[in-house]
Swiss-Prot record:
The modification Phosphoserine is found at S760, S771. Keywords: Activator, Cell cycle, DNA-binding, Nucleus, Phosphoprotein, Repressor, Transcription, Transcription regulation. Residues 720-742, 817-845 are annotated as: Disordered. InterPro entries: Cyclin-like_dom (IPR013763), Cyclin-like_sf (IPR036915), RB_A (IPR002720), RB_B (IPR002719), RB_fam (IPR028309), RB_N (IPR024599). Belongs to the retinoblastoma protein (RB) family. GO terms for molecular function: DNA-binding transcription factor binding; RNA polymerase II transcription regulatory region sequence-specific DNA binding; transcription cis-regulatory region binding. CDD domains: CYCLIN_RB-like. The keyword Repressor applies. This is Retinoblastoma family protein. Phosphorylation by cyclin E-dependent kinases appears to negatively regulate RBF activity. One of its GO terms (biological process) is regulation of cell population proliferation. Pfam families: DUF3452, RB_A, RB_B. Residues 376-706 are annotated as: Pocket.
Amino acid sequence: MSEPDPQELGAEVVSGLVATSDDRLEMINAEYTNLCRDLNMDRQTELQGYETYLEVSQRCSMEGTASHWMCCAIYTACRRTSTPTVTGQNAVVKGNCVSLNNLLRCCKMSIYEFKTKIKQWCDMANLPQEFVNEIEDLDRKFSITFMLHKRFRIIMDMIFSCPPNEKKHSKYISLHGNHAHGKCSYIKLDDICWRLFLCAKNQKPSNTVDLVTSYNLMICCIDLIYNNVLAEKRTDLINPKFEGLPSNWTELDFRHNPHCILSNFCDMTEEAKAMKATTFRQIMSSFFQASTIYGNKDTMLGLLANENFERNLKSLNISYEQYVLSVGEFDERILSAYDAGEHTALNDQSLRPPVTPLTRKQDLPAQPAMAGDKFEPVRNATNNVKQLSAFGRITEPTDFVKQAGEEVIAKLLSIIEEIEQKFLAKYPSTEAKSRFQLAKSFFFYLLDQILQAEIRNKPDIDLKRLLVQKVSLVIFNITLMACCVELVLEAYKTELKFPWVLDCFSISAFEFQKIIEIVVRHGSHEGCLNRSLIKHLNSIEETCLERLAWARNSTVWEMIASAQLPLPTWLMVNLDRAAGPLQIFLRKVYLLGWLRIQKLCSELSLCEKTPESIWHIFEHSITHETELMKDRHLDQNIMCAIYIYIRVKRMEDPKFSDIMRAYRNQPQAVNSVYREVFIDINEDGEPKVKDIIHFYNHTYVPLMRQFVIDYLNVTPDVSGRASDLQLSPHPKERAAQPKKVTQSHSLFVSQMSKNEIQQSPNQMVYSFCRSPAKDLQAMNEKVRGGKRMLSFGDEPGLGTMAETKRSKISQVKAVMDDPELQSAEQQTAVTTEGCVGGEGGEHET
């Protein structure tokens, strides 16, 4: 093999001028204008959305229906405006009161399509993180409600029955049906119950930030409607097969007494009853006070009486509509008009079962008996909470732990009190105290189990001394408590995802990953953690090992700085029985890296010995070029190791696009891994990020090139030509035969070679990231000079075509699998939707 020449390490990318016809732009203008007229949108928001749409369309290739991208632009513009209200001086609501569901209807766009496209739009439009967080919250809230409605449908069918003269679950009838005025029909009963729940959960959003609490609230609403049906003696609406019915409910002299059916549908009955007596009653009292509902305030009956039912349904609808317009969320009433089972796309996109990480699969308990059933998020979350609640009776350290002495225990309780105050200050829910109490109970249980296991493993050690040593270890107690809090948050399916606990308690990921293995070992062996929770712990440990622990401010870099370089290899850390924290950390990193290399090589159908060679390249990057991991992701280095091996070996396949496709099939895969790779720190102190092509070409190859060549025994050939190590995201252009343009004429087109193209004496060159902006402006003026100028109105932004023509240089999709031998310093790569590109280069016109 020939040794690669450093001069031939460039990544070829073609930047082209994609001209957009005036007719096409005129059609877009007209379609956008008509869409805004249908929505009755204000002019300012309309212009703002259109400008954003044009700006993004100039930079990115927007595939699919244009109206769908317009929908994203309009929604973004609407959410970033405020509308004055008449409720008080200077009072405003966020948004311009354009309904999201109405917007989707006008754009002929499904909820599933919107949820997918709006996330891509956030990336393409470079929207602020605050807005991205709002979109994630919107997505998550709807996913929870979608799953709850599926349970709602099942429970309602168990309790109530549809009279023979009514159509059950007819589409749209619940929104537009005609029924006898004043009398509650089966479909309207379904409507009022679902709307009552929607209004109740929005009344106190902080109380329903998790799946389990929202489910309990929904059961409380169903319980209330059930009692009202019994009180009105609407036996025609009751399912006689329901097990929770009073024994004498069919008798003529039946008198209704408060009857609770929570135990029929809640595994955690006490928690649901506590909510019914406190939070739910407070919400209903506020509804009566605000005249949102009418009936007997004390007994909460009479909601379905002929004189109250219609106005209650109307009032709940108005209240919910006002809320939806003010927050810009999906109108979740539409779920009443559809069968959730028909929406396979939404089912796939809703709350999914936890993925199985590659590491520590042997610690997972056996699949439960119902494992063959379809994953049910509500049941899974309830089971998780129920399992942790079994330890809720433990309110203080066990007698075994107390043997450490009063002074040590007092210090331990002081640490826990300090942690609790931090949690209560940052957890956005009135349930914060009960959540932490559950975590604290589990902490006391785990602490007892861990210390007793230590005694069993070291029977000769002094008990008192061991207890004092362990219980007094501050970082051990803090990380163990944080791990218990994380388990409780995961069990309830709250919106606060890892690494929130690290920020809450100011813990480094390097310190936190130490405790996870201990918790998993004792939790799985004692049976206090089920399969789902252990999967979660394994997953967040991998997150620490792959990314968080390698952050610039991580304590691991202090240890690396004081260690003897190069860092120990896989063999060294496994032979060292007296390994320290750094060695144990590297042992976990090496194992994780090896498992992922094996998985990717298997997906790529590489030969059996290939993973070992790639492993040695990866190991060298950790031991000798450790800086490659600083502020970066393990998978970024693994993908680069695979590709540099392929390039040195001169293999035709797989391409880099194949590597990325295989990576996207991994359980831990996220797009940001190849879209946003840390490069350097800017002058203003902010991190500079580029795509993985730039990182591979300009950072990875210069550091790893010589080692890979030496390790794989690449030698120069006679001609002295070199292979190309570096990555080209542009497809390889193969020589093609002359192509016949049409069958009716003997007209052929053949490709010109590069040396046939005559250079223009008046050429203009613009180098991205290097040339000043005025050069690009001059180039654009040159291009626009020969174009006809059409005026369609006096309105700025939408009227003058000259101002909105997309004659600027447009980005071309960069596909990362071309092995052409071109210099990266002479070409440029640009990112588009769903792909990545390299650094800027030159463009001629």
